[in-house]
Design a protein with these regions (language model features):
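Conserved active-site and cofactor/substrate-binding residues in soluble primary-metabolism enzymes
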Residues: 16, 63, 110
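Non-DNA-binding regulatory cores of transcription-related proteins
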Residues: 102-118, 122-123
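Short secondary-structure junctions
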Residues: 72-77, 119-127
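Short terminal or interdomain "cap/linker" segment that borders an active site or interface and mediates
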Residues: 69, 80-82, 89-91, 125-145
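Short, internal active-site loops enriched in acidic
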Residues: 4, 94-97, 134-136
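Conserved segment of winged-helix/HTH DNA-binding domains
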Residues: 2-30
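Amphipathic interaction/junction segments at domain boundaries or subunit interfaces
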Residues: 28-107
Length: 145
């Protein structure tokens, strides 16, 4: 006799959580909200880096950026790394925060913090800069390293 196994997958609530987070951050002064969102992203990025390479650092910035892009993809960002004219970038073609990031651009600071934290753990301190985002009408979120 065959037995059937039922699989249940929880519904994704990224938009709901993103909206809630965006509204909560909107209650703070803008600079404080941005700082808090980036700080939380940075802490989580450090955690992710420690899980990827406990005690090991990447040997090159290029390698670390590629690893960060792969990790962002595994978290719903559909990211890839690219480099031109000596500048490395992480391009995310999807945002797991969806419409919430467009409605509450402060959520982009979480992404910036994630990138900064992962790079700090894998390579060393860097100063990534968000140079384009869905929230500003671009077709992708681009972080320059």
């Amino acid at each position: 006799a065959k037995s059937e196994i039922a699989f249940e997958f929880p519904a994704r609530h990224d938009d709901l959580m993103g909206t809630l987070l965006g509204r909560a951050l909107a209650l703070l002064p803008p600079k404080e909200a941005d700082r808090l969102a980036e700080e939380v992203g940075h802490e989580y990025g450090l955690h992710l880096a420690a899980e990827m390479a406990p005690g090991d650092a990447q040997r090159s910035l290029h390698s670390a950026v590629a690893t960060v892009a792969e990790t962002l993809t595994s978290h719903g960002f559909a990211a890839h790394s690219e480099g031109t004219e000596g500048q490395l970038r992480i391009v995310s073609e999807h945002c797991p925060f969806g419409q919430a990031a467009i409605d509450h651009p402060v959520l982009c600071a979480i992404d910036r913090g994630l990138v900064r934290g992962m790079l700090a753990g894998l390579y060393g301190e860097t100063a990534p800069e968000l140079t384009g985002s869905f929230a500003t009408g671009k077709s992708a979120c681009t972080t320059s390293v």
